[in-house]
């Protein structure tokens, strides 16, 4: 199964990974995707799994199946009907990039096993969704309050600062911190325990209703997939396609999305948050989680944004920890060739003159295809050529 093969690297290291690493594995590193747990009681060799592999979402390499220590019945059980779920992919990148996926927040808290008993898209009591524009959060789940203080931020696709890393002060919250764009997010209402048996975990199937994030919303009308699946085993791309096929459309159209991308690339300044984020917190989070949020502060100064980021980088330098350089495409190409039995890529580097400067041209050969790139150094040219080849052959 292709979705299992894509997660081979994670599944091989599963027994040696910490709980925090297992949670981060649910957020693909190189591009947005959807990581689904492989339950111990699940059937991942049957016809239902084969149908998933034949879909467009699977062929686009956005569906991953990773190992799990749980049975499907061990998952956190939300209400029988009426709980919400995002229909967006997940992404682990923390650098500046235009992305509408859900992102994890790196923090100093220790993870517990129970925090893995949910999907990142589900409004569970184990997940705390933080919209862009928020700087700090105060939570009171017990006697002592807890402050979530953002220490690093990036530019969201709506130009507001969004939290990337945070420090937990006070009582540990033991919740998964996840961020989303408050200007463009899509949710559905999930009704579990409907008639029918899931083709993977044998649980009851689920139906879905449209929320206010959709146009032509039909309150109370339930829609179900032709493929019998529960919400735990259903890729979010299937739910999105289901809603689109029933006449629903997101408020942010594809054309508007591309216009926002061009604006994001053109505008260097950040947008100050001037809207009330209380409604977004209420819509995204579980009812009990929302009630525990007593106070939040949003960015009202770009100077504070730059100061927080510069302080975060300065601390990393003092601790001799380099920032995330991004994916190593040379290594990824080698892994791709070993995984599928192809001859490893070869590189040819020559010295050239480009724009009056001494440069290097690297040619990458892989699978009867070649890519060329020019860079100021041999290393830079080789990485750029490998990146072009990886995006051409592996995506």
Curated annotation (Swiss-Prot):
GO molecular-function terms, A-Z: RNA binding
Domain of life: Viruses
Key words of the record: RNA-binding
Putative autoproteolytic cleavage motif (motif): residue ranges: 320-327
InterPro entries to which the protein is assigned, alphabetical: dsRBD_dom
All residue ranges annotated as the DRBM domain in the record: 328-395
Protein name: Non-structural protein 1
UniProt organism field: Rotavirus X (isolate RVX/Human/Bangladesh/NADRV-B219/2002/GXP[X])
């Amino acid at each position: 199964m292709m979705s299992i093969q894509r997660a081979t690297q994670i599944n091989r290291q599963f027994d040696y990974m910490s709980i925090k690493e297992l949670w981060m594995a649910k957020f693909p590193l190189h591009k947005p995707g959807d990581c689904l747990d492989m339950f111990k009681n699940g059937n991942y060799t049957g016809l239902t799994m084969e149908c998933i592999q034949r879909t467009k979402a699977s062929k686009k390499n956005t569906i991953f199946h990773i190992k799990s220590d749980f049975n499907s019945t061990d998952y956190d059980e939300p209400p029988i009907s009426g709980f919400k779920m995002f229909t967006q992919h997940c992404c682990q990148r923390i650098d500046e990039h235009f992305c509408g996926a859900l992102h994890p927040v790196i923090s100093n808290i220790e993870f517990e096993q129970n925090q893995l008993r949910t999907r990142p898209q589900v409004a569970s009591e184990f997940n705390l969704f933080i919209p862009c524009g928020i700087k700090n959060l105060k939570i009171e789940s017990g006697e002592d309050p807890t402050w979530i203080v953002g220490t690093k931020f990036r530019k969201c696709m709506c130009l507001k600062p969004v939290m990337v890393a945070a420090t937990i002060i006070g009582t540990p919250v033991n919740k998964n911190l996840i961020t989303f764009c408050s200007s463009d997010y899509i949710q559905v209402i999930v009704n579990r325990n409907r008639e029918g048996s899931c083709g993977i975990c044998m649980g009851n199937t689920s139906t879905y209703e449209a929320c206010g994030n959709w146009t032509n919303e039909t309150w109370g009308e339930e829609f179900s997939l032709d493929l019998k699946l529960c919400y735990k085993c259903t890729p979010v791309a299937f739910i999105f396609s289901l809603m689109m096929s029933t006449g629903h459309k997101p408020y942010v159209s594809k054309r508007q999305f591309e216009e926002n991308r061009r604006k994001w690339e053109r505008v260097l300044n950040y947008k100050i948050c001037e809207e009330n984020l209380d409604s977004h917190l209420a819509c995204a989070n579980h009812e009990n989680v929302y009630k525990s949020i007593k106070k939040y502060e949003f960015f009202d100064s770009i100077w504070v944004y730059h100061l927080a980021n510069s302080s975060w980088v300065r601390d990393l330098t003092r601790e001799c920890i380099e920032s995330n350089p991004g994916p190593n495409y040379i290594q990824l190409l080698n892994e791709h060739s070993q995984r599928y039995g192809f001859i490893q890529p070869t590189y040819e580097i020559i010295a050239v003159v480009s724009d009056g400067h001494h440069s290097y041209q690297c040619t990458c050969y892989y699978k009867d295809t070649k890519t060329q790139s020019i860079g100021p150094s041999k290393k830079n040219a080789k990485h750029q050529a490998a990146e072009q080849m990886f995006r051409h052959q592996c995506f």
